Each structure stands twice: as structure tokens, then as C-alpha cells.
Amino acid sequence: MSFLGKSGQSSVYAPSDILYRVRHLALITFFAYAAVCWPQGAVGNGTFEGYPAVTLSNGTLQLTITLKGSTLTSIVLADDQERLSPLWNPIRMARELGQSHKFDGGAGHFVCVDGFGAASPEENAAGMPFHGEAHAQTYEVHSGREGTSTTATLTAKLPIVQEVFTRTFRAVDGENVVSVETQLESLLGFDRPVNWAEHATIGSPFLESGVTVVDLSGSRSQTRPYEQVNNGPVQRRLQGGKDFTWPMAPGLNGKPIDLRQTPDNPHYLDHATTLLDPTRDLQWVTALNPKKRLILGYVFRRSEYPWLQYWGNYPPTGKMARGLEFSTQPYDVPRREVISAGTMFNTPMFRWLPAKSMVRSKFLLFYAHIPEGFGKVDDVRLENRQIVIEDRSAHKQVTLAATLGL
């Protein structure tokens, strides 16, 4: 078979060459379609599993944020034909198992304010939800442009704790990085401790047995104490209440378990915490799927989030979830327990919210392709308005523009 080249001369191609050209043309068509559908600087109305949401696009990424909870439920690359979000979708997982799941704001990356863990019996009687009020409220949305950035700001009052929670997502045109800035305002006239966690959670199929790995900027760690080994279809595999150095945790069988890895033969439930590196101002956590050549990560200040809780739910169904939960406290436990303990590893377990005042936090999240052979993250740095991600053993790095910085 022959085709006419640009020179006007006939060129001959093997069938494999023709197949390549067809695939290449399909990719060009897809990217052109994506560019039309996901223009730079777009905010629109959308849904997540039938629930009202706002979509934010910058030509490279598309985010879906639900009005309930200001929850980031999906993040997708414009050039990804799979449209694969790395984030946990419990509604889809339940549906695929022939079950139902009611959305309460808990999915993907949701916020736990003011509370991270179970409410006390008295709080529960007063209507306080598990993980605080912020993820359970319905938010007002305002969107717009700030220079080359598209923004979506979501605001809600937390009626029980008398706080106002405001979260702003900002995405610069064409970048793989999103800035998330939050304000928490007290409406009361006294100082009080605040319990706050960013419940970032990845899920299947991005979370894949024997493939997906998690890296972070910390070492001193502890497994969560527990009493019950078996918990329905999953069982504990870590010794409870034991200190260890990330990522090798003590297993019940006496052998160390590498917590970077997603376990084969899933039927496990893991829980541990890591104190983030006290020698660094900026901390990071990443989730990497080398088979799909995709990476999700976060960069944030240690002064705002000194802890990272690891929750791994690996049922035999393969509908898995893993929390990358950076927070003010090591574990999701009732506030009374947190305040009574005060510190762990000589590090505070809460932050203060002054009377009639406001505290702020900010983090960056990124989602991007990685090169072939990139299999481990040794460091993530924010320098010169760029995020640099390194795999030193492979002698590879990924550099992403991060105009907004921290």
C-alpha cells in the first residue's frame, strides 16, 4: 500500500506502519477534542455520581468538586484516554459490587474539620458527624479568573462548632499543579484547639496490588493500637502500637512489611502514622503507579500538618482504598483523646484557633505523567516556582511548573 508524501513522491509502508499512523491520527483527534472540551480557564456546573458539583479545568487537568463537603472527588489529565482519576470513589466501587453507597461528602480528597475521627457520645447526641462537620455541609460557590489562574471558592458555616470554612482551588493555565488554600474562622470569643486533617485517599484501579507505591518525607512512625485482628473480610497484618522507621513496619508474623507497597493477595486492613521530617519546612507525599506511568502528590507546610496517617483498606474484592491523610494529629480519634494526650513524639497533636480570628492553610497537589522506569520518589522539592520530583536510583526526575507556590 502506498501513500502520497509531502514531496509528492509515493512512499511505501508496512501494515505495522499503517496501524501506527491510524493510532497516531486517533491520538491527534482525541487531543484536539480534549482541547475543545477542556479549554483553559473553565469553571462549570457538573455532577459526581449524580451529586451537584463544580468542574475546574485549565487545559491540562480537570477537577470535580462536590458542593457537599467541598470534596475533590476526581482529578483527570486532559490527554489521558482512560480519564483515570487516582482518587477513591466508594460509590462506583459499591455499584460494581451490586451494592449501594450514600454519599456523605466522604470520597476522594475530603476535609476533616473540626474533628478527625469519632465524635464523643455527647457530641454525637448533639449532631456532630464522624470526621467533623465540614465534609457534611453544602457549600456556596464563587468562581472567577485571577490573571492566568482559574479559581473556585467554596464557603460554608459549621453550625455546631460555630466556624466558617472557606476553601479556594486555583489552577494556572496549562499546569499540572493545583493550589488549595483554606481559611477557618471562629465565630466564638475564646481560644480553642482545632482538629484538622486532609483525608486524601487514592483508590482502585489506580491503586493496584503489587504495583502502586507510596513515598513520603518522614521516618519515625507507629502502628495504630488495636484489639481485634479480624474485621470481616479483612484482617490486620501489622503489630499494634509499635514504633518503627518508615516504611518497614513490624508484621504479626514477625517479619517486616514494606508499607510503600500495595499488598498482593489483598485481604488486609492497615493503620499507622508517620511524623513528618522535622528538619524540613515543606513536606510531601506521593502515590505512583509505574505501570500506568502516573503520579499524584502533595506538598504542604509541616507547621500546618506535621503528621501523616496511613489507612489501607485492601479487601479481597480488589475495591481498595488508601489514605494519604496529612493532619494536625497522628490518628483519627475523638478530640478529647487528642487534647488529653497533647503530644506524641514530642510533637503537638492539634493547632489553636484564636477567639474571633482566622487560621489558614495551603497545600499544592499535582497529577502528572512520569517517564518509563520511574519507580520510586526519593525527594520532592519546591524551587524556583517548580516542583521537582526525583527517582535517584533511576537517575530520573520530573519537573512541573508551580507558578503559585506555597
Predicted features and spans:
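Short, linear, compositionally biased motifs with a strong N-terminal bias
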Residues: A14, F31-A32, L207
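Surface-exposed acidic/polar loop and edge beta-strand patches at domain peripheries
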Residues: P39-S179, L187-L406
